[in-house]
A protein has these predicted regions:
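Sec-dependent N-terminal signal peptides of Gram-positive bacterial secreted proteins and lipoproteins
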Residues: 4-26
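Generic detector of short alpha-helix boundary/capping microenvironments
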Residues: 6, 10, 33, 40-41, ...
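A general, composition-driven signal for non-globular sequence regions
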Residues: 8, 12-15, 66, 109, ...
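Residues in and immediately flanking transmembrane alpha helices
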Residues: 16, 85, 287-290
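Active-site-adjacent loops and short helices of periplasmic peptidoglycan-processing enzymes
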Residues: 23-195
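Domain-terminus/edge residues, biased toward the C-terminal soluble/receptor-binding domains
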Residues: 161-165, 173-178, 182-391
């Protein structure tokens, strides 16, 4: 009875405390190499770990430059996001405008008024870097290429691409159309982390369109020469030079190498291979097991349930120097209790991954279900039930 009376009193007070703030996954203890350590044949470059975003190498990574057809990574990102939102569909027929028809550079020779499925358009962009297809998709998603370029800039801002400005959807040289190696890595990582289907398109070596009449050959020659390559996008223009954003995976370690402003295709692929080789030679993706005594629930104060079940995201993998992954330790950090309301999916703690006492990365612990705060209506119902039980 005392416990019920206290609960009823709390109902009247309706005290609601703030939940713990979330913890972001991160990697620590890694010092990136630079061109002072070793150089690659290009104007700017960066190598990052895809999972954590940790920079492993950089050279003039914040220098603003044209990026040629690597621009299409953002075009593809917006297209895949529209697909995910159900705004467009792979079997939609995308019309070709006069504007798209007049795109120069690499193309699949689309004709004004021609229609092609979005799926085929995406193949043309990913495999053959078709400018006409990129602009047609941009117009289909955004209404016009100009409007789509604004969408690209908004998305770039959201991703923290602070040194990027897009003017077109395909990457042809145009005044003010600029980015950096670091920003390219950011958008490449966003694409690869959240739209993994792009790997399926980018890993196709050869395909055909129009019933076999149009042949597509992948512009990323690393597909045939580098073990573990998964993408992503090449680019070449007079002002940008020869460029690539290359992604690769070996033994669970996923890397992204961005190379801008090489003098030739050979040097571009050489630079990307050198960066990826460096990453795979010096780092590994290591895991730590979750402690066996990790709590499965937490007490909840002022809630309609006494406890909240917990959802432990996998301790996953941490980026580690090569050969040092075997000493990782997972430590659970949780508060003594939570205060309602608790929302399913909210971060309530974290799994901290330690290496010799130093935190390397962390992963969230979330509430597995909602726990509402005590409400006046709930209290009245509880009071009524109490009175009925007494009778």
């Amino acid at each position: 009875m005392k416990k019920r009376a206290v609960t009823l009193l709390l109902c009247l007070v309706l005290v609601v405390l703030s939940l713990l703030r979330g913890f972001a996954a991160s990697a620590a203890g890694i010092t990136p190499a630079t061109n002072a350590d070793f150089d690659v044949p290009c104007a700017a470059a960066i190598l990052i770990d895809e999972d954590s975003g940790t920079v492993l190498y950089e050279k003039n990574a914040d220098a603003r430059r044209p990026i040629a057809s690597i621009t299409k990574v953002m075009t593809l990102l917006l297209a895949f996001e529209a697909l995910e939102a159900g705004k467009i569909h792979l079997d939609d027929f995308v019309p070709v405008s006069e504007h798209a028809y007049h795109m120069g550079g690499s193309q699949i020779w689309l004709e004004p008024g021609e229609q092609m499925t979005l799926d085929d358009m995406l193949k043309a962009i990913c495999i053959s870097s078709a400018n006409d297809a990129a602009v047609a998709v941009a117009e289909y998603v955004g209404g016009s290429e100009t409007a789509f370029a604004e969408m690209m800039n908004v998305r770039a801002y959201e991703l923290g691409m602070t040194n990027t400005h897009f003017v077109n959807a395909c990457g042809l040289d145009e005044a003010g159309h600029l980015s950096t190696a670091r920003d390219v890595a950011l958008m490449s990582r966003e694409m690869l982390l959240h739209h993994t289907e792009v790997r399926d398109y980018c890993s196709i070596w050869m395909d055909t369109l129009r019933g076999g009449a149009t042949q597509l050959v992948n512009t990323n020659k690393l597909l045939k020469s580098y073990r573990g390559i998964t993408g992503l996008k090449t680019g070449t223009t007079g002002k940008a030079g020869v460029c690539i954003s290359a992604s690769a995976e070996r033994d669970g370690l996923r890397l992204i190498a961005v190379v801008l402003g090489s003098a030739s295709g050979k040097e571009r692929f050489q630079a990307a291979s050198t960066l990826l080789d460096y990453g795979f030679a010096h780092y590994e993706s290591a895991a730590a097991a979750l402690p066996g005594d990790a709590p499965q629930t937490l007490p909840v104060e002022h809630g309609t349930a006494a406890t909240a079940p917990l959802n432990y995201e996998s301790p996953g993998h941490c980026l580690m120097p090569k050969g040092e992954g075997g000493t990782l330790e997972a430590v659970v950090e949780l508060p003594a209790s939570l205060s309602a309301p608790v929302a399913a999916g909210e971060q309530v703690g974290r799994i901290k991954i330690l290496h010799q006492g130093t935190e390397m990365c962390s992963y969230p612990i979330t509430a597995a279900q909602n726990v509402d705060a005590l409400s006046f209506r709930y209290c009245l119902r509880l009071l009524a039930q109490s009175l009925l039980l007494r009778n």
